[in-house]
Amino acid sequence: GYETLGVPMPITVYTTHQPMPMKCCIKTASGFGGCNAALVLSLPDAHLKQKVNLQATDKASAPSVCKAVVESGNMVTIRPGAVESKGTTVFSSSETDFAPFIREAYKHLGENNMKFYKMDNLCKLGYVAAEYLLKDTNYRPKEIGIILANASSSLDTDCKHQAIISKEGDKAASPAVFVYTLPNVVLGEICIRHKIQGENTFFVCQQSDTASLEDYARIVMAKGKLRTCIIGWCELLDGHYQAEFKQLNNISTIYG
């Protein structure tokens, strides 16, 4: 960070989440084609006062948020050595180390996308979980969304990227590694594969919270009129991995 161009400033880094009152935030976006943007969002004083007044009133008087009525569809869990669908093991292996296991789990599907083998480990984990979850399903691109979360972000690949720079210098940085130093890239790989054009969001939080993900999914499903939405936990770091994907189907009257 810097206050004046070219003048470095120290950045305070914490190992734990730090609560703080927020009046402004910066929303950034970047794309593989080099399209980058940053937007500053600020709460006006009037809104801050309104927020305080709203918190002081009865919750029943607060405006309601439209949420879709949903039912659970397919569920897929990936843990060391096994892939489960609705609690039933659909693939198992004596291999528990991630690299050989995930290759076997992918080949078991009968798929042959060579790009899969070039992905980083987090993308491979999410990609395979989505393959098992959406097998034999068919949705129009704008009828389906996906919302994922994890605790370690893309740290597994971030560390590999930093190790290359630390050992060989900046010029040795590999674009093939750097491109995966964002956790939402796994969403991109899944969306490309399954032609998903609905809501796609990746949250980074301390622990899995399926209830919060489902609540958020119900809001975006109602707003975007999605027929189905994938929610899930996709965590991988230092050889430890876990994926829990769940499909929510919209049964609101608009699809009755």
Model-derived regions, located:
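Conserved "HGTGT" condensation-loop signature of ketosynthase/thiolase-family condensing enzymes
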Residues: 1-256
